[in-house]
Amino acid sequence: VTFSQGLELTDRSESGVAEQNGTYVEFVVDREVFGDYAYNMEYVEQMVKNYTYLNLGLTVVLNGKPYISKNGLLDLVNDTMSSEPLYAPIHITGEDIEIVITHGNGYGESYYSFVNGQYTPQGGTHQAAFREAIAKTIKEFYRKDYDPSDIRTSIIAAISVRVDDPIFE
C-alpha cells in the first residue's frame, strides 16, 4: 500500500519477493508536509532494538543492517553494560512477564521497562513494584534491615509485562 499526504495511492502486493513472510515498510519524508525534517537515527535504531528484544526471533532490517535478539531482555541488559557485572544476569520469563537483573560497578539504578511492548522510560507501577520487591526479598532473605537504596545501588534491570487494559498516565 502506498500513501502520500494521507491518501492511499496504490494497493498492491510485491511481486518477485523471495520472502514469503514479513512486512516491508519504507518511510520517505514528504517535504511539503514536514519541511527539512531529519530523522534522529539513534532514536530510531534504539526503537528497532527494543522491538527485537521484546519479540524473540523477529528480524528488523534498518538501512540494510539486520537487528535480531535471541535472548530477549537478556540481550538488552548485556548490550547496555559498559563493564562486567558483579554476577551473571538473572533471567526470568513467564507467560506475561520477563525480567533480567544484575548489579554493575557503578552508582545509581538503571531500569529498562516495558508494558505491552511499549517502552516506559518514566517507569510505572510495574517498575515501582519491582524495585520494592527486590529490596524486600533481599532484606527478608538475609534477615537484615538494609536500606533499600543500598540494595538497589548499581542495579541494572529490565522488565517487560503484558497487562490487560493498561492505564498510561
Describe the role of every protein-language-model region.
Residues 1-82:
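GHKL-type ATPase core
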Residues 42, 49-51, 57-169:
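GHKL/Histidine-kinase-like ATPase module
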